[in-house]
Amino acid sequence: MSDIKLYGYATSPYVRKTGCFLYYKQLDFEFVPVSPLNAAETLDFIGGTQVPVLVIDGEARRESSEHALWLDERFPERPLCPSGHREKILRLDKWVSDTFLMSIFRGAIDSEPNLQYRYRFWRLAALVSAHTPMPEQIRHLWPDFVAQAPFIKAMGEKMDLTESPADMAMRIGMELAAHIGEGPYIGGLEQPSMLDLAIFPQLVFGVMFGLEERLSAGQHPVIKAWLSRMAEHLPANPTLVADTMQLMSISDALAALD
């Protein structure tokens, strides 16, 4: 049996993405939480602070989309990027990476720093601290740290910030629904691929862990039906965040939309 470890921040969408690859393939693995306060020390075996880092039998690699291809090489069952659909999947993966996943960081870039904003990032700090405890003062200042992080600023430089956050969210939601189409999975594929597994945990994360009251993406009927299908392929908590921090199940969140 292979020794598999996934290193990352508990709240990183890219870490959740690789985690869902592993869950879908039904591989036993160890999640090693990385503290943002000493990431370089934890990741000294590979250098830098970028996550996720996937280690299989001592070999370490970065880049979540590359993880899908590597996992298929090592563990061909339940493919993430089937050879017959590789070109389509990699083309759509560019949209997932450059548009969908990047948009997750919009709220940290140019949102008004009001109390609602601070509550959101205090909650994220609590989720991080549940795995890698942080001092109370650091948690209190977390909204400010995130807003000033070089990684976040770099994301902002790649976005069209003249488009309002609401318009961006609506546009990307409609694009996702179009990519699902008649389904059953993204791109019209018959089985989930790396595309579905990259997006699903991001859409359910907020409602599961207290960042939104309702599963907002599920208000679109195409996306809601797709979420229900995807949930059948993954554990009840596919996010890597501790179960003790969960406030709502995916099944309850979907039922609340009926």
Where are these regions (language model features)?
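GST-like domain detector, emphasizing the conserved glutathione-binding G-site
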Residues: 1-135, 254-255
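Short alpha-helical hairpin
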Residues: 44, 141-152, 248-257
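Generic alpha-helical structural signal
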Residues: 65, 90, 170-174, 224, ...
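Alpha-helical scaffold segments in carbohydrate-active enzymes
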Residues: 91, 95-98, 175, 201-205, ...
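GST-like fold's C-terminal all-alpha helical module
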Residues: 102-218, 222
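Long, positively charged, glycine-interspersed low-complexity recognition regions
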Residues: 200-258
